[in-house]
Amino acid sequence: MSSCPAIVNMKDDDGIGAMGAAVAFAAMGVFGIYFLWPVVGPTSAGMMMKAPGAAGWVICRAVFEANPQLYFTILRTAGAAAAAATFAACSIAS
């Protein structure tokens, strides 16, 4: 028996590196679609509208139509940013 540690072959294989890069790129694409689709999807489907009384803000049309009185109450008491943030999520309506 020898007291020397075993020699390990550390050969760099370019095929594995390219495959790993492709898998990482695909994973980033899936990650991006998963987290960005809820933001981009409803606006492209036409479910969003300009927030009344809050210039520059966009809110979910279905949520606003379900309870416009609540929107205007929040707009008067807490301001445009709070009202738009409350009515921004379209997942509540679906």
Curated annotation (Swiss-Prot):
<comment type="function">
    <text>Involved in short-range signaling required for pollen tube attraction by the female gametophyte. Required for female fertility.</text>
</comment>
<dbReference type="GO" id="GO:0016020">
    <property type="term" value="C:membrane"/>
</dbReference>
<keyword id="KW-0278">Fertilization</keyword>
<protein>
    <recommendedName>
        <fullName>Protein EGG APPARATUS-1</fullName>
    </recommendedName>
</protein>
<keyword id="KW-0812">Transmembrane</keyword>
<feature type="transmembrane region" description="Helical; Signal-anchor for type II membrane protein">
    <location>
        <begin position="16"/>
        <end position="36"/>
    </location>
</feature>
<dbReference type="InterPro" id="IPR039926">
    <property type="entry name" value="Egg_app_1"/>
</dbReference>
<feature type="topological domain" description="Extracellular">
    <location>
        <begin position="37"/>
        <end position="94"/>
    </location>
</feature>
<keyword id="KW-1133">Transmembrane helix</keyword>
<feature type="topological domain" description="Cytoplasmic">
    <location>
        <begin position="1"/>
        <end position="15"/>
    </location>
</feature>
<keyword id="KW-0472">Membrane</keyword>
<keyword id="KW-0735">Signal-anchor</keyword>
